[in-house]
Amino acid sequence: MTSTGPETSETPGATTQRHGFGIDVGGSGIKGGIVDLDTGQLIGDRIKLLTPQPATPLAVAKTIAEVVNGFGWRGPLGVTYPGVVTHGVVRTAANVDKSWIGTNARDTIGAELGGQQVTILNDADAAGLAETRYGAGKNSPGLVVLLTFGTGIGSAVIHNGTLIPNTEFGHLEVGGKEAEERAASSVKEKNDWTYPKWAKQVTRVLIAIENAIWPDLFIAGGGISRKADKWVPLLENRTPVVPAALQNTAGIVGAAMASVADTTH
């Protein structure tokens, strides 16, 4: 049975306004869980499986189905993807197989789940939704920008609670280089930079974004945000910067949020 809305953990398939289901697809792992949409907390444990190699659309879809079926979930679900997605169709592929490009991920994953309704969105966009509803950006009006610092730089823009998808600020040109070539945390590690030296590059990226859209708040995500005290105070841009609060659950939570929004509009 396919639900028309979010479910309860007690009765899979029942409709309520409390619970949703999210899947976070990463280069190394695919994880999912049931989310309490009132609190943004996971209900029970999540399930995490290794991302198949090669990470082709069908192989990933089958792994997603394993996670979903592990919970007995039969309602709509949200799935994050590490790249640009428009109208359910994948446009870029960085950490997954190139055969994703042009694939209707919504239909491919839905077919493996027997026709369950699937909402696909960029992974940073999912994290941005979660952080602005339940995390570091909660109760922050106006324009909020989430930046995830890792191998590259992911981005999400939320305006008064509404997602503006696929911003891809990591590819913004800053001083003749893409932003992520200048300030991804992987660049810091590769060059063995100190936090002060890396913070100068992050500042340049933040100022470039500020000059374009004048945000009210930056949220810094990615593993390096756990050490925000070592570098956020060194930033010299004008907009406040706060570390992400949800960390490893943000993708799952944001995906669950998106699935509910997709079924109620």
From Swiss-Prot:
ATP binds at D24, V25, G26, G27, S28, G29. Keywords: ATP-binding, Kinase, Nucleotide-binding, Transferase. GO terms for molecular function: ATP binding; glucokinase activity; polyphosphate-glucose phosphotransferase activity. Residues 1-22 are annotated as: Disordered. Its EC number is 2.7.1.63, 2.7.1.2. CDD domains: ASKHA_NBD_ROK_PPGK. Pfam families: ROK (PF00480). It catalyses: [phosphate](n) + D-glucose = [phosphate](n-1) + D-glucose 6-phosphate + H(+); D-glucose + ATP = D-glucose 6-phosphate + ADP + H(+). Residues 1-18 have a biased composition (Polar residues). It is an enzyme of class 2 (transferase). NCBIfam families: PolPhglucPhase (NF045942). Belongs to the ROK (NagC/XylR) family. Catalyzes the phosphorylation of glucose using polyphosphate or ATP as the phosphoryl donor. Polyphosphate, rather than ATP, seems to be the major phosphate donor for the enzyme in M.tuberculosis. Homodimer. The poly(P)- and ATP-dependent glucokinase reactions both follow an ordered Bi-Bi mechanism, with glucose being the second substrate to bind and glucose 6-phosphate being released last. The mechanism of poly(P) utilization is not strictly processive and is most likely nonprocessive, where there is dissociation of poly(P) prior to complete utilization. This is Polyphosphate glucokinase. The gene is ppgK.
